[in-house]
């Protein structure tokens, strides 16, 4: 079963520590990301690493912007988005000040490049211009080298969105950038722009043609660099919807099990039956007395199998949150788990980085403390989360 779970993981999903952006005192680092094509990916990496996001610039939040943004560099208050990518790449928290954006030195003049000359081949490398944060920027030579390598070595569209091609590119010392940076550069800036460098089209295959047509229909999804779900062209619309629901149902269950394992670091049984229970309101959780009228047989039946309407409703809600906040399935399900399955609290957390009631989200250590038969520990949890939220958490874990 463990092997099956490993095989089921998304190879392109975040793999860095879930506490990468958590301070030593246990509080989460808060980030504000300026609108940009990379915002979705950065948000996913930040939330996966235990950080939080704010919709507006708040005191104490780390302000992120892409190098080259004039307003951000002029203010001197922004940190380069490369900080997130480098932290994730090294899986360690780096020094923020090393990535602070600011006006370029007056004496520095960027060397001029001629794309027409580079199109025939990559010229001898000159010292690369560096951003104020100390990170090398991509030159035209880098772009041509990346496009040429992809054209010659990518066997299919999936190899471009995977990791193996880019790791091999890094080992070949094609550029001085990391494979993550080159992959991000190609997917966000270079793919579909080959003609500007006087190069041929990207590798053509039936699958890449389908991906291209899909990208034309959904450009936002194409920018994300994420492979789209395959759609069987000959299936009637109704059958396709059923197939899609079935695929998403399996994905939701798989991601919840995966999220639970990462969040709680516990061993999952061979027949994992952990289901997310989305609380639609903030009323007190049901008490045993309120459930006493339910027959034992019915309870066992409900525990053994979740009804199709319930699954459909859960999938619909998760989809809505994914679309509303432009996040992936893993991030949304993690947020539900950390907020005891409460819809309002989860939505608020995804939007602002904190719950509407002002209480913190649940961590693995909090859940471990919750299992202790210790009155002092329980009182501390009540003080931290409030009696109502503690009761909800207990009920949520039972389910």
Curated annotation (Swiss-Prot):
<dbReference type="GO" id="GO:0070187">
    <property type="term" value="C:shelterin complex"/>
</dbReference>
<feature type="domain" description="BRCT">
    <location>
        <begin position="10"/>
        <end position="101"/>
    </location>
</feature>
<dbReference type="GO" id="GO:0051092">
    <property type="term" value="P:positive regulation of NF-kappaB transcription factor activity"/>
</dbReference>
<dbReference type="GO" id="GO:0010833">
    <property type="term" value="P:telomere maintenance via telomere lengthening"/>
</dbReference>
<dbReference type="GO" id="GO:0043123">
    <property type="term" value="P:positive regulation of canonical NF-kappaB signal transduction"/>
</dbReference>
<keyword id="KW-0804">Transcription</keyword>
<feature type="modified residue" description="Phosphoserine">
    <location>
        <position position="158"/>
    </location>
</feature>
<feature type="cross-link" description="Glycyl lysine isopeptide (Lys-Gly) (interchain with G-Cter in SUMO2)">
    <location>
        <position position="214"/>
    </location>
</feature>
<feature type="modified residue" description="N-acetylalanine">
    <location>
        <position position="2"/>
    </location>
</feature>
<keyword id="KW-0832">Ubl conjugation</keyword>
<dbReference type="GO" id="GO:1901224">
    <property type="term" value="P:positive regulation of non-canonical NF-kappaB signal transduction"/>
</dbReference>
<keyword id="KW-1017">Isopeptide bond</keyword>
<comment type="similarity">
    <text>Belongs to the RAP1 family.</text>
</comment>
<comment type="subunit">
    <text>Associates with the I-kappa-B-kinase (IKK) core complex, composed of CHUK, IKBKB and IKBKG. Homodimer. Component of the shelterin complex (telosome) composed of TERF1, TERF2, TINF2, TERF2IP ACD and POT1. Interacts with TERF2 (but not TERF1) with its C-terminus. Interacts with SLX4/BTBD12. Interacts with TERF2; the interaction is direct.</text>
</comment>
<keyword id="KW-0963">Cytoplasm</keyword>
<dbReference type="Pfam" id="PF11626">
    <property type="entry name" value="Rap1_C"/>
</dbReference>
<feature type="cross-link" description="Glycyl lysine isopeptide (Lys-Gly) (interchain with G-Cter in SUMO2)">
    <location>
        <position position="114"/>
    </location>
</feature>
<dbReference type="InterPro" id="IPR015010">
    <property type="entry name" value="TERF2IP_Myb"/>
</dbReference>
<dbReference type="GO" id="GO:0098505">
    <property type="term" value="F:G-rich strand telomeric DNA binding"/>
</dbReference>
<dbReference type="InterPro" id="IPR039595">
    <property type="entry name" value="TE2IP/Rap1"/>
</dbReference>
<feature type="short sequence motif" description="Nuclear localization signal">
    <location>
        <begin position="383"/>
        <end position="399"/>
    </location>
</feature>
<keyword id="KW-0007">Acetylation</keyword>
<feature type="modified residue" description="Phosphoserine">
    <location>
        <position position="36"/>
    </location>
</feature>
<keyword id="KW-0597">Phosphoprotein</keyword>
<dbReference type="InterPro" id="IPR036420">
    <property type="entry name" value="BRCT_dom_sf"/>
</dbReference>
<feature type="modified residue" description="Phosphoserine">
    <location>
        <position position="156"/>
    </location>
</feature>
<keyword id="KW-0779">Telomere</keyword>
<keyword id="KW-0158">Chromosome</keyword>
<keyword id="KW-0539">Nucleus</keyword>
<keyword id="KW-0010">Activator</keyword>
<feature type="modified residue" description="Phosphoserine">
    <location>
        <position position="43"/>
    </location>
</feature>
<protein>
    <recommendedName>
        <fullName>Telomeric repeat-binding factor 2-interacting protein 1</fullName>
    </recommendedName>
</protein>
<dbReference type="GO" id="GO:0016604">
    <property type="term" value="C:nuclear body"/>
</dbReference>
<dbReference type="GO" id="GO:0006355">
    <property type="term" value="P:regulation of DNA-templated transcription"/>
</dbReference>
<dbReference type="GO" id="GO:0010569">
    <property type="term" value="P:regulation of double-strand break repair via homologous recombination"/>
</dbReference>
<dbReference type="GO" id="GO:0070198">
    <property type="term" value="P:protein localization to chromosome, telomeric region"/>
</dbReference>
<dbReference type="InterPro" id="IPR009057">
    <property type="entry name" value="Homeodomain-like_sf"/>
</dbReference>
<dbReference type="InterPro" id="IPR038104">
    <property type="entry name" value="Rap1_C_sf"/>
</dbReference>
<keyword id="KW-0805">Transcription regulation</keyword>
<feature type="cross-link" description="Glycyl lysine isopeptide (Lys-Gly) (interchain with G-Cter in SUMO2)">
    <location>
        <position position="196"/>
    </location>
</feature>
<feature type="modified residue" description="Phosphoserine">
    <location>
        <position position="208"/>
    </location>
</feature>
<feature type="region of interest" description="Disordered">
    <location>
        <begin position="1"/>
        <end position="21"/>
    </location>
</feature>
